[in-house]
Design a protein with these regions (language model features):
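Membrane-embedded alpha-helical bundles of multi-pass transporters/translocases
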Residues: 4, 8, 14-317
């Protein structure tokens, strides 16, 4: 492997090769049980209960519930989001690749971040009695820490699907289960979050969002622990490298396909955030609450059905 470093291959290339080449991995094309596939998919359900809430309701929560000016809320979400994409994401990927425990490389991160993820999710939707400037600082700190933990959880979680088995068919099947879990989370957020916030807050928006997030955070933490307990890393990449973190970051910057995918991903998430964040303002300011709930329910239900249909078609049903 070290000889390849002198022949134009970067450390990133070697990692990809080691994770995909039958000659460089130690694993069998093992068929995964339905229990393991469901257990793994619960991790994405857990993450998206929080992520979909952030995308759809965080801006609204900051401005209309916590009382942060719209300009400040936009700046917080935008700047911290970019830091998460361009700093937290690559650093956590490199750190996860250097992890070696009796549980594997990637599974431990799901375990280590399960409780912090839940706690920070609750704190991000908590409204302490602070001055205007203190609220802005509080939002910066909690949102930054939440995105850091999200990266520490979601990067290893996503990589885990590639080391559960070396069977391409089984990996595709796992992805299908995972996609269904994402759509279920999206449906829950779009259909149930606002009614839950009203019910659990007894008309108090701040208490409603806080209590709803406590419910989602508790569910998410439990699902992360189940994902950790029901999965096993079987593909063992063999990569001999003594590169530093700086070297790895340099390799990433020189890897044009990686840079393109990073930019496309960031733009896609910006689009999701804009669409999700603006929708609730439009329907709150121009339509009644009942129309808003019905509209969101229809979107969620239709997307859920379309997503399930696409998955079943892809699986040959």
């Amino acid at each position: 492997m070290r000889n390849l470093l002198g022949k134009g291959y970067t450390n990133v290339d070697l990692i990809i090769m080691s994770a995909s080449s039958p000659a460089l991995v130690s694993a069998t094309n093992q068929k995964l049980s339905v229990m393991e596939k469901i257990g793994y998919s619960l991790g994405d359900l857990a993450a998206n209960l929080i992520f979909q809430t952030l995308v759809t309701f965080l801006a609204f929560f900051y401005t209309d519930v916590f009382g942060i000016p719209a300009s400040e809320a936009t700046f917080i979400i935008g700047t911290v989001g970019l830091v998460g994409a361009f700093v937290f994401t690559p650093l956590m990927g490199i750190l996860a690749d250097r992890t070696s425990t009796r549980w594997g490389k990637f599974r431990p991160w799901i375990l280590w971040t399960a409780i912090p993820f839940g706690v920070l999710s609750i704190l991000a939707f908590t409204t302490p009695d602070l001055t205007q400037d203190q609220k802005i600082v509080y939002a910066y700190v909690t949102y930054t820490l939440l995105l850091l933990i999200y990266a520490a959880n979601n990067l290893p979680y996503s990589a885990l699907s590639g080391v559960l088995t070396s069977s391409i068919e089984e990996r595709n099947s796992v992805s299908a289960y995972r996609f269904v879990a994402v759509m279920v989370a999206q449906l829950i957020i779009q259909v149930l979050l606002l009614p839950l916030a009203l019910m659990l807050g007894n008309g108090d928006k701040a208490a409603g969002f806080h209590n709803t997030m406590m419910l989602f955070a508790g569910m998410g933490t439990l699902f992360f622990l189940i994902a950790f307990a029901t999965t096993k890393e079987r593909v063992l990449p063999i990569v001999e490298s003594t590169n530093s973190v700086i070297d790895d970051l340099s390799d990433c910057a020189k890897n044009l396909p990686w840079v393109i995918m990073l930019i496309v991903t960031v733009l896609a998430f910006i689009t999701l955030a804009l669409r999700g964040g603006i929708t609730i303002y439009y329907f709150q300011n121009y339509l009644s609450a009942a129309d808003l709930a019905a509209f969101l329910e229809n979107i969620g239900f239709n997307s859920f059905i379309a997503g399930l249909n696409a998955v079943f078609m892809g699986m040959g049903f």
